[in-house]
Structure formats: structure tokens, C-alpha cells
């Protein structure tokens, strides 16, 4: 039980994060692991969506040329990140449907009036093989990181039982992904195929 008015939340507020050299040296996992997944092929002047199928839905990439957005609610807190097709913008949607990356039954809708701000997350770095972006200095990067952290809901930041911060797909992005999966499996969208995808 709690003694002297201490409980789990009280204690965790006093914990320090990242003590010792094991954090600094990335002990146990010194290499940055990553996987390259092709999501589009260049055909003449346009990008054609592509993907590799997997038996595990979480390993199937989101196809095509995409845009990433952060949605802030009326409290000025980040409520979700959203992946859209290249030609979509949440600012043009009266209702924003947030689809789960893999689960068809999981989705939620946000009215545009409930969104205070839509922030584009991508920046153009290279254009026609040339650098077109001026990289910020370390202090500017730190300031942006701090501002982003401040705009997270406290429930996402807490150490015990944190809320999950969602990254979702627009309805159009979800439909594109499902259509491509179905065509690669030789099935009709929305129906199960007896053919198993290659991993």
C-alpha cells in the first residue's frame, strides 16, 4: 500500500530518465535498424503505387506518393497524424475519416470545425537532384521538438498506462491500399481470397 502519501504516479514524477552510459552508447542495439520498402514506381512522369504483400498486415506498407499531416484539436493538442494520397488535404475535408492502418473495423471521424490546425509534416529537401532546403541549427531543432512535445496530450506523455498516439489513413488512402492488396491477390476488394500472399 501507499505510505506517507506516496503512490505510483507520485513516485514516477520523481524518476529520472536515461541514467548511465548504457543509454548514451545504445548498449545492446548499437546499429540503427531499418527496412527499405518500395511503395511507388516511376512510369514516365507519374508515380504508380506499389507494395510488397505479407502474411502480417502490419508489414504491408502504405502504397503510393503520400502526404503526412498532424491534426490539432480545439485544445491545441495533437490528436492524430494522418497519411493521405498526394492529391488530398485534410483542410479540404468537411469531415475527416481516420482509418486504422490494418483493421477495417477501426475508424473515427472528426468534424473539420473540431480541428484547430492542420500541419503538413513533410518538407521538400531535394528537387531535380538539388538541395532546396536550408537545414536548421541544433537550437532551432531543439525548440521545434520542445514545441511538439508541449502540444501532445498529457495522456500520451505519461509513463504509466499512456494513451496510444494514432497514425491513421484517410479513407482514400485506405481504399487505395485495399484495392492494391486485392488486385495482387487476384480477389475482389472486400472479399477474402484463398490465395496467400508471398512474404
Where are these regions (language model features)?
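Gly/Ser/Thr/Ala-enriched C-terminal appendages of enzymes
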Residues: 2-199
Amino acid at each position: 500500500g501507499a505510505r506517507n502519501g506516496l503512490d505510483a504516479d507520485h513516485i514516477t514524477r520523481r524518476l529520472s530518465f536515461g541514467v548511465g552510459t548504457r543509454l548514451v552508447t545504445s548498449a545492446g542495439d548499437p546499429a540503427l535498424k531499418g527496412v527499405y520498402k518500395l511503395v511507388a514506381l516511376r512510369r514516365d512522369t507519374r508515380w504508380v503505387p506499389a507494395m510488397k504483400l505479407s502474411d502480417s498486415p502490419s508489414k504491408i506498407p502504405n502504397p503510393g506518393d503520400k502526404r503526412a499531416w498532424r491534426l490539432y484539436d480545439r485544445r491545441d493538442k495533437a490528436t492524430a497524424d494522418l497519411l493521405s494520397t498526394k492529391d488530398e488535404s485534410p483542410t479540404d475535408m468537411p469531415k475527416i475519416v481516420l482509418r486504422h492502418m490494418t483493421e477495417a473495423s477501426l475508424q473515427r471521424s472528426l468534424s473539420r470545425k473540431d480541428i484547430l490546425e492542420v500541419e503538413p509534416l513533410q518538407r521538400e529537401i531535394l528537387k531535380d537532384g538539388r538541395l532546396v532546403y536550408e537545414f536548421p541549427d541544433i537550437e532551432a531543432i531543439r525548440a521545434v521538438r520542445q514545441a511538439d512535445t508541449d502540444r501532445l496530450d498529457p495522456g500520451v506523455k505519461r509513463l504509466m498506462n499512456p494513451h496510444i498516439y494514432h497514425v491513421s489513413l484517410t479513407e482514400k488512402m485506405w481504399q487505395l491500399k485495399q484495392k492494391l492488396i486485392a488486385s495482387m491477390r487476384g480477389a475482389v476488394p472486400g472479399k477474402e481470397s484463398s490465395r496467400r500472399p508471398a512474404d
